[in-house]
Amino acid sequence: MPEPLTLRMVLIVIVGVFLASFVDGIAGGGGIISVPTYFLAGLPAHLALGTNKLSSCIGTAVSAGRFVKNGYVDWKLGIPSILLALLGSHWGTLLQLSLDEKVLKWLLLIVLPIVAVVVLRQRQLPEQRREMDERRRAAVVWLASFVVGGYDGFYGPGTGTFLLLIFCTLAGLDLRTASGNVKLVNLASNLGSVFTSLMNGKVFLLLGLIGAAASVAGHYIGSGLAIKDGSRIVRPVVLLVLALLAVKVVPELFV
């Protein structure tokens, strides 16, 4: 059982989750802030991850809704992506519940340099959709939705960033459509993970709902900036998120 809810826990979660969701609403990757927030609030590892998914799920729904409203979603790619992300996330969460946390940190250490190379080699995230075989585009998007959805259930930080990079650079989607589809996939993977965590008693419901209120505000403001300003805002935030990911994970592996 979690500790009784305290004012300190509430304040830490409100501030940390708002900042995380603001970043996530622009470019994804807010989990690198929100997951440590729940640790700082005093929750053990699996409970922190499950509670984070609850607040992220509600906030991401608001962000996704703004992209849908503005027409920045490719539904032919999006509907299968949602189903695959749900499935991948469920399996990823089951695996996460069975493993030691340090395994997850080593995974990030392996993935991070690969992502950094992709970002730094790309001069800017494309504003225009690239011509390519539509079957290949769909295969890339659907495979990424399943695999990264599994990673999101397994641990999570960086999920939105990884998806955005793949959808833009490998699947050739324009930045805004990629961002809209990323939000749908991220919402689906959050739903799959939070359901699995709830079934295993790994969600602090009250604290997660408090975090959800902060998440809604952060996602709404952040996604509005992404829609208005495109890659001028998203690219620097992607690079910042990757830097934060490295600063957090690498030292913890050697403690």
Where are these regions (language model features)?
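Selective hydrophobic functional segments
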Residues: 50-103, 110, 190-240
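Residues within membrane-spanning alpha-helices of integral membrane proteins
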Residues: 10, 53, 108-112, 116, ...
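Transmembrane helix-loop junction
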Residues: 40, 47, 93, 97, ...
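Hydrophobic alpha-helical transmembrane segments in multi-pass integral membrane proteins
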Residues: 147-157, 193-201, 208, 245-255
